[in-house]
Amino acid sequence: MQIILLEKVVNLGNLGDVVRVKDGYARNFLIPNKQARRATASAIQEFEARRAELEKLAAERLAAAQAEGEKLNGLTLQLSQKAGVDGRLFGSVTNHDIAAALTAQGFKVEKAQVRMPNGPLKTVGDHPVAVSLHTDVSVDVTVSVLGETV
């Protein structure tokens, strides 16, 4: 299916690109999430008329994400969990826990934006975690897991 991208999509293209994707990906993900539109002749003309407005909105979102990223970059987040004597946690610290802690501090972060390359944190100590605020803005946050002995 031919689609017009209404915003930058990772591994696919930028705003305004006409790309070919599988029908299910377009119908079930890109179009419902307002990231793309079916590329018909009328849709292409309408997009070209609104192109400046959409580019302005994309630039505003990027600027807002960069401002949020400057506040968030280098932040150390402290979370406490029950742990054994050897420093292993009973349970783990997931991206949901980190997103909830950042939201409690006043940042708008969803759990899908928290990137944990090694999976959930299962030991006490400092762990680097990436937070992706925008497709072009990613910041590093240090999560300090404190152990509560049982």
UniProtKB/Swiss-Prot annotation:
Whether rRNA-binding counts among this entry's keywords is yes
Please spell out the taxonomic lineage of the organism that makes this protein: Bacteria, Pseudomonadati, Pseudomonadota, Betaproteobacteria, Burkholderiales
Named from the GO MF annotations, one term is: rRNA binding
What GO terms fall under cellular component here? ribonucleoprotein complex; ribosome
Which PROSITE patterns does the UniProt entry name for this protein? RIBOSOMAL_L9 (PS00651)
Q: Which UniProt keywords apply?
A: Ribonucleoprotein, Ribosomal protein, RNA-binding, rRNA-binding
Role according to the record = Binds to the 23S rRNA.
* Protein encoded by which gene: rplI
UniProt protein name:
Large ribosomal subunit protein bL9
**A matching Pfam family:** Ribosomal_L9_N
HAMAP family in UniProt = Ribosomal_bL9
Enumerate the InterPro entries for this protein: Ribosomal_bL9 (IPR000244), Ribosomal_bL9/RNase_H1_N (IPR009027), Ribosomal_bL9_bac/chp (IPR020594), Ribosomal_bL9_C (IPR020069), Ribosomal_bL9_C_sf (IPR036791), Ribosomal_bL9_N (IPR020070), Ribosomal_bL9_N_sf (IPR036935)
Record's family? Belongs to the bacterial ribosomal protein bL9 family.
The source's domain of life comes to: Bacteria
Q: What are the GO BP annotations of this UniProt entry?
A: translation
